[in-house]
Amino acid sequence: MEPLRKPLVPVKGIPLIKYFAETMEQLQNFTAWPDDVLISTYPKSGTNWMSEIMDMIYQGGKLDKCGRAPVYARIPFLEFSCPGVPPGLETLKETPAPRIIKTHLPLSLLPQSLLDQKIKVIYVARNAKDVVVSYYNFYKMAKLHPDPGTWESFLENFMDGKVSYGSWYQHVKEWWELRRTHPVLYLFYEDMKENPKREIKKILEFLGRSLPEETVDLIVHHTSFKKMKENPMANYTTIPTEVMDHTIYPFMRKGTIGDWKNTFTVAQSEHFDAHYAKLMTGCDFTFRCQI
């Protein structure tokens, strides 16, 4: 098998993993169904966590049903493509309604059908400092990415939007703005960590669903970081090692808030904060880098 690490390929100015970029043309013909629900995040912002929560909601908290397949098969990854693994579009064709779909795509690359149908979107945003540290470690173990280089160079690339999926700043802002015209529930990773039950109840209300209190408690318990890290149907250990090497870093590494402090130097943190302030000026939402 040829090495998977390839340079990122720009599509409409957005750098993407080569294999994902190659699906973009086909992706534009994707047809959304009215009862589809989209989970959208920038990478390393709680996508897998939200996927597991959503599947447990749809399955009424029944653990046997949630264990029917790995999470990436239960919640198809729209733009995913990789040698030796079924692509997201193929998985979606075999997924019965109502479908839950996940994506990291910015709005400029999203299939128009998803916007035209005005399907419900659950967006999860996470503070940029924890995202960039998690992303750096993910680049190391997920071999579809190019080599991340040094932490210092990766940090600069992240700030400049020269990583897969482009600018974090643009991503979190444009999906926030979409709330004004489309049904978007915008959640924060930090709020989910602080009080998962409260956030799950927000999701249920948004979806127009109800579950008994004990089922909600069960979902909170089984979607905790500890339980998911132990669950092979949720922790991505079933992905081929050639694609994700868990001996370098586990896919589910820490899942904490404020871990950035163990990687950023004081100078890097100050440099990042100044850059962040410029790019996030005028935003009517804020992030917490610790709780």
From Swiss-Prot:
GO biological process, one term: thyroid hormone metabolic process
Modified residues (Phosphoserine): 134
A Pfam family reported for this protein in Swiss-Prot or TrEMBL: Sulfotransfer_1
Active site (record annotation): 104
Binding of substrate, residues: 102-104
UniProt function note: Sulfotransferase that utilizes 3'-phospho-5'-adenylyl sulfate (PAPS) as sulfonate donor to catalyze the sulfate conjugation of a wide variety of acceptor molecules bearing a hydroxyl or an amine group. Sulfonation increases the water solubility of most compounds, and therefore their renal excretion, but it can also result in bioactivation to form active metabolites. Displays broad substrate specificity for small phenolic compounds. Plays an important role in the sulfonation of endogenous molecules such as steroid hormones.
UniProt-recorded name of the protein: Sulfotransferase 1A1
UniProt organism field: Mus musculus (Mouse)
